[in-house]
Each structure stands twice: as structure tokens, then as C-alpha cells.
């Protein structure tokens, strides 16, 4: 396993290595060849069509609440998945700009020999590796529990097995979707199982690629803010050092340039992320509600365990986005104090004016949003959980 993880590292992209690898493998970053692009786009749109068949099935089963909730629990997450894929492919050019900026800015920081800055770079790199691999493991576990859910239901319930034998229970499937043939009897049932398993693996890999890319980008922006604050602390050198007005202007110009680029690309990143997060927030409350309702309605321990894992994944996915976005917001606010943590009081009048100008520039910040109505913060996370609980209580009544 260690050798495989090491093979994911990229010397040209020391920060984004594993994330860039999975983005390319899953076709979110399209290859240069025309044939490769066509094949990946065909794959993505095939899955988009499959999600449409889930909603076709939803119309067929609309009179059965339990079947509707089972369908919605998966189909809403499926919709979010294809929105992520299609927006990433559609806005390919802008995503590449963001990723190239991250690589360039990260390589610039790694060339610095200052021990404090090197420690910050090493800390956020290690954190992103651990977070990426943990999230991949969580997605893999969710994939296994989702695909094995019908099997566990069959093995854990003798009543269900007996009902299947006498024909009162249909063949259980991973997803609730329309098929153009009889999916409840052989060979159609096994073709459907294979089809669903492949699509579930695809969806899990897409989520692993997209979500970790989003989170490590947020972590990078937070790390960049820490580094900018550290630079501001030493803009006048060590205590007792005197710098000329020209040197001060050069330092302020460099800090200003770093901050302008940071704001530019964080806003570009937010413009790519915000529409997807808005759609995700709308779906998330309903998805969590359906999962919680089915968890409390499950008849045996095995089903409850599988439902609980799926619910935990949904909450963890939302929490990771809101937590790291909130962390960037806090670091934005802390970064503005950087110039006043320097030896500004030893500077002359002209240099102090430069400090004031810089501090005004650093007050400009970017907040990651979920559409025009909500910010990606911890209060938003709590409000979504409250909304999901409200829907849940309505269903229970």
C-alpha cells in the first residue's frame, strides 16, 4: 500500500500529486487526445442518463413511501455527483487555471529556506495527504456498504429469504432505477446487479476525486494566508534592523501582489464551487432526512448498521466542506493583523503609511459560498442538520 501511495506523488506537483492523479484517471481533467476526450465525455453522459432512469423509476413507485425514500436517498446523491462531473468538465479551462496557480504558488513557497515558512508548508501538505487518504477510505467503505446492502438484507433476515422464495418479495437491487427489461428475474436481475455495481464504483471514485480536490484547495488557501501573515510579520526584518524606503516599497509591493493573486484565484475557485454547493445544500437536507428515517425504520441490526454508515458519510461530507471553508474565513481575519505584528513602530512616517495601505488591502477577503443565499461555514452546517431533522419529524408524524 505504501508503495502505491508513493507512486501517486508527482515531483512537478508536490502538493497536488494524488489529487491531480485521480482527477486525470476519472476524466475530470480531460486528456489532450480527441479520442480520450470523447470516451470520457461519453462515460460521464452515460451516467447522467442512468440518473435520469432513477427518477423514471421514482415516478413508477411514487405510491410507496418506503420505496420512494430508498430511491431518493441514493438518487439525490447521484444528481449531485453528475452535477459535479458536468460542471468540472464544462468549466475545464478555469479549473486548470486554479490548479496551475496552486502548483505555481506552492512551488514558490517551497523554495523558501525560512524554517517557519517551511514548517507551515510541510504541515498543510501532510494534513492534506492524511485528509485525502482518509476520505478515499470513507468513500470506499460507503461504496462497499451500498453495494452489499441488498446482500446483507438477504443474509440477515430469514423472513425476507422466505418471502423471496414464495415470490412476495422482489429481487433486491443496489439502486432503484428503470431498466428496459425484467430486472427481477434471471438473467435480467444479474445484468442489473453488474450495471449498478459498476455505476456505484464510478460514482464513488468521482466523489473521491472531486471532494478531495475541493477540500485540499481550501486548505491550500488557508496555508497561503498563514504564509502571508508570516511574511507581513517580517516585512521590516528582525528587531533593530533598519530598512530604506525603497526596500520597504519592494516588500509591500511583493506582499500586495501575493494577496491580489490569492484573492483573484480564491474568487475564481468560489465561482466554480458555489453553484455546485448550492445544489448540494438543497439536496443534502432531503438526503439526510431520508437516511435518518430509514435508519429508525430498519428492522434488523445489519440494515441499521448499513444505514448508519451511509448517514455518517452524508454528514461527514457536508462537515468537511463547511469546516475547511470556515477555517479559511478565520485565517483571513487573523491575517489582517500581520503588518501590526512586525516592527512597524521602528519605521519612519513614509513607511508607516505603506503599512496602513497594506493593512487596508489585506482587509479584502473572499468567503466561500453555497449559491447567493448561504456561506460555507459551520453555522450553515448546523442549519442544514436542523432542516433535515425538521423534515424527519414531519415524516415520522
Annotated model-derived regions:
Residues 2-32, 36, 118-120, 133-142, ...:
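Terminal membrane-anchoring module of integral membrane proteins
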Residues 2-23, 29-30, 34-71, 104-217, ...:
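Helix-loop-helix junctions within predominantly alpha-helical proteins
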Residues 94-101, 216-220, 224-231, 327, ...:
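Membrane-spanning helices that line or support transport/gating and their immediate boundary helices
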Residues 47-48, 71-74, 78, 94, ...:
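Charged, amphipathic alpha-helical oligomerization/scaffolding segments
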Residues 55-59, 98, 225, 358:
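Short, Φ-rich (hydrophobic/aromatic) sequence segments
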Residues 74-94, 144-147, 204-220, 224, ...:
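Hydrophobic alpha-helical membrane-embedded segments
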Residues 57-62, 86-93, 262:
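Cytoplasmic, membrane-proximal interface of class
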